[in-house]
Amino acid sequence: MADVRKMKETMIIIGSGAAGLSAALEFAKNGTRSILISDMPSERSQSVMAEGGINAAMDTQRDCPELHAEETMKAGRYIADSKAVHQMTEEAPKIIKDLFESGMAFTLNENKKPDVRAFGGQSVKRTFFAASNTGKQLMYVLIDQVRRYEAEGLIERLTGWEFLKLLCDEEQAYGCTLTHKVTQQEKILYGKVVIASGGLNGMFGNATGSVRNTGAVTA
């Protein structure tokens, strides 16, 4: 087994789309180093293809995070984790504000503020968007921020590596094994692991997203 690296204080993030980049940024802001693992560059992730928008209950149409959470749970047939959904809807307005202030090119209303539109499963307009390329604009902002922390050594991106398996004891994961797509070299990384590998498109015969999201990490 080649290149065994012990990084107990380093977070290992599997996936470098919007979720993976966001996780790395949060760790970096707190001074924690992270390594992003992906088999392709962030610029080619599934997140780039997202078109619809980002939901957040801002001060429009008497909306509120509680209503946002209620409608999100209903749209998901109440399968979702209620605590996680409520946390998401509480934090969503700040995320929109931060993205706008970071330069994300949202479609604007007549007051030069991010506009909202209707979307499925919602009784009010709460979807913030960037024309029909919301995902691409979001990734521009996240990648730009990640590069700044890369320069400081707080974020490292390992591209071209595929996840093989978690290393686990009886209670938790303590690392993972990777293989290089071209050379088949194997690498072991030690540290806490975050799974942000995206959806399961490749597991289905028909999917509207990229089949590069094979679902292999989840499987």
Can you name each region flagged by the protein language model?
Residues 39-174, 178-180, 196, 202:
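Conserved N-terminal/central alpha/beta ligand/cofactor-binding core
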